[in-house]
């Protein structure tokens, strides 16, 4: 078996409009397709980063909360490569998004910062 690449990442949200606004207005993703599924009372929306499909955003009525803590089993966080951490941090701040302090990865010297989506999923910006 030979994997080619990561095709997409599926994210389930508890408040569709809030999460859609976060991923599009804060992170700058574009909506490729948006479908309301009446039989499930849910949305399925495909989001692109730089024109490439990357995130599949789902809403479901009353989803269970995310496990607490970043060290819970399963997906730990989403990481996005950026050119300039300082510019990204300033933009997060102007949009009212709380974030951790910028840190330096000791093995590579790369800089990174964590913040959370509306449902508490950790997101990382990473710059080398």
Language model feature labels by segment:
Residues 5, 41-43, 74, 109:
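Exposed loop/turn and edge beta-strand positions of beta-sandwich/beta-sheet ligand-binding modules
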Residues 32-34, 40-43, 62-68, 101:
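A short, acidic/glycine-rich surface segment
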Residues 57, 68-72:
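Helix-adjacent hinge/juxtasegments
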């Amino acid at each position: 078996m030979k994997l080619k690449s990561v095709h997409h990442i599926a994210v389930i949200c508890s408040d569709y409009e809030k999460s859609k606004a976060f991923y599009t207005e804060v992170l700058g993703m574009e909506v490729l397709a948006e479908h309301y599924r009446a039989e499930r009372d849910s949305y399925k929306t495909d989001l692109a980063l730089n024109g490439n499909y990357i995130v599949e955003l789902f809403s479901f009525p009353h989803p269970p909360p995310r496990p607490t803590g970043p060290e819970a089993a399963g997906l730990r966080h989403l990481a996005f490569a950026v050119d300039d951490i300082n510019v990204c941090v300033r933009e997060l701040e102007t949009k009212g998004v709380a974030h951790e302090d910028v840190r330096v990865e000791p093995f590579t010297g790369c800089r990174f910062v964590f913040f959370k989506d509306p449902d508490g999923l950790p997101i990382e910006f990473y710059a080398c």
